């Protein structure tokens, strides 16, 4: 009798465990990450690929990319959620935003209560325009590295929800091969803080004929990038900047009157937590992982005037990129029309290195070029449920398309005719 009961119990337990296993398998297969590799990612690999800790819930797919080279065009195909994608990637139409020879420095906070800037012995000619490929249809910017005959794709496509593309780290590449890549969701906040700092009015109509060339002369925005992203190498941060700012540059391609181009004239990388005092002093006292976005701009006016004049004199605006959250959800801050002003040419964006800040960086540069929130103009910020404007006050992360409004395009054109935009006509680039 005891043996009979024991046998029944074992059979029941076996059936129960099998049922639980089936339920678990079904739930795994129905999840978004059903194409995850069967080898579990290590903590270091997860951080390297997604730029965040494993405690963060990230939606991603593990895909096999097939490529074909036809002259200078790369044909790329892959499948996500049963849907096939076929992209044509062409070499970037313009010079890379990060030319070979761009100054890269490090910043360290020393015990003398000051930030010291040091030259970094690092640059990489492989990240010039020949390595950047793009697709205007889905606003894709891809950095292609070719090593030993194998191509690796890292980048972002931002027409729809921000999607990052990442090649595999060494261990996984040895297991799965170089054709496998991760595609992951990298959407970030598009809610920001703006200040009106423009102090020079538009040029009077009777003087317009003297500077009419301004409206058609391309505007070159020379940017100094401040990277407060610790635990990343100079090589990796330079790669991130190349992809990130080429993606922003691509978003400005539809702007034609005047054309707007981005060039990075310097990168400064934080080497310790207090290196960038304008960010460090904007943190919340009760939680140092949170930052008050508006204070970064206020603090920056002093910080850049004190620490950067001796090192850099060839930039129209600085963009600080940091990974700290703002408890109010703000993803960026800047000053309207401040790009050529020595005290207002400051912008801040949140990005952890995953390209989640591409949209807000485009938005903030639009503000610096005197674009306002469309809700504050006669233009609607929502075309329909699927299309929002880039300068929407609080854009939708579910929109399938983002466009420049007619109000913003007019603001850019008018601003380019003023003395407040004079620096954008200067193509000087100090080597």
Swiss-Prot record:
Ranges for domain Peptidase M12B: 228-428
Record GO cellular component, one term: extracellular region
Chief site of localization: secreted
Record-level Gene Ontology MF annotations: metal ion binding; metalloendopeptidase activity; toxin activity
Keyword set, alphabetical order: Disulfide bond, Glycoprotein, Hydrolase, Metal-binding, Metalloprotease, Protease, Secreted, Signal, Toxin, Zinc, Zymogen
Disulfide feature: 340-423, 379-407
Subcellular location: Secreted
Catalytic residues identified in the record: 364
Keyword Nucleotide-binding among UniProt keywords: no
Any one of the GO BP annotations: membrane protein ectodomain proteolysis
Binding, Zn(2+): 363, 367, 373
Subunit details: Monomer.
Protein family: In the C-terminal section; belongs to the venom metalloproteinase (M12B) family.
Name the UniProt record assigns to this protein: Venom metalloproteinase 1
Organism whose genome encodes this protein: Eulophus pennicornis (Parasitoid wasp)
